Swiss-Prot record:
PANTHER family: ATP-DEPENDENT 6-PHOSPHOFRUCTOKINASE, PHOSPHOFRUCTOKINASE. This is ATP-dependent 6-phosphofructokinase. ADP binds at residues 21-25, 154, 185-187, 212, 214-216. It comes from Streptococcus pyogenes serotype M5 (strain Manfredo). One of its GO terms (molecular function) is AMP binding. Its cofactor is Mg(2+). GO terms for biological process: canonical glycolysis; fructose 1,6-bisphosphate metabolic process; fructose 6-phosphate metabolic process. It comes from the Bacteria.
Amino acid sequence: MKRIAVLTSGGDAPGMNAAIRAVVRKAISEGMEVYGINRGYAGMVDGDIFPLGSKEVGDKISRGGTFLYSARYPEFAQLEGQLAGIEQLKKHGIEGVVVIGGDGSYHGAMRLTEHGFPAVGIPGTIDNDIAGTDYTIGFDTAVNTAVEAIDKLRDTSSSHGRTFVVEVMGRNAGDIALWAGIASGADQIIVPEEEFDIEKVASTIQYDFEHKGKNHHIIVLAEGVMSGEAFAQKLKEAGDKSDLRVTNLGHILRGGSPTARDRVIASWMGSHAVELLKEGKGGLAVGIHNEELVESPILGTAEEGALFSLTEEGKIIVNNPHKARLDFAALNRSLSQ
């Protein structure tokens, strides 16, 4: 394989630029040419494709976001969109693609592979909700950003004796809420993987104020449960009488310079993706499991909620985020006593 392309798709995540940089520089070191595709699959279909060299990725490792831009392009789920994209790839002499993104991006990579066009996926999403890997690019940075924000909210919460509901991103996964909640010493963490009793949440707030000598209370809420405003309303209906405030950290979690960990795993996975394409392997997703590089069939990792995937050698990679998140939730309850 002499010429490959790289794209980012879906929601942006800190560390994507580090992955792009690794793909480009590793490919060049292997004697391959690299092209960048702007705006993900939309740019592929539009032919927004251009050469990338070492100069173009210089100083990008520390930058958040993605300099290749990103977009959601549901039209690529249709055969017409897929064939149009492949036509553009062939027009530019591209023989394989590295796709950086979440489960939607993986579905696009899977379709390319089904059409006989090798594609390798790299997990890039702050949600950490991709099967076949312990960590996704951007998750560590998002957690650190959330912790920094919650620490600051605690300052004002304690100054005024208030309860804060802090809503964080995560869609159907509570990883950001759990990790950030534990690291910031949150009093309660609410995630979609675990049922909660709103009356118990309210009574816990009251008990902390009246019997534990606390003058403030922090609740970290994953957006997949409900919005922070809706949760606060339910708390009031359940009898909470504390001075309640809601803060939605929102898209701030996607921004910022990536942490050292995100830069390292992005570089590691980007380099390995190139190695796979050089060997002519497609339809695979790169991941990190037990601090080791692994690859899994993209078909299994692209299925939302998949609890495991298989390597080419048939090795099972357990990916049971539900159990892990419940274990973390139990840990936080024991620490918030």
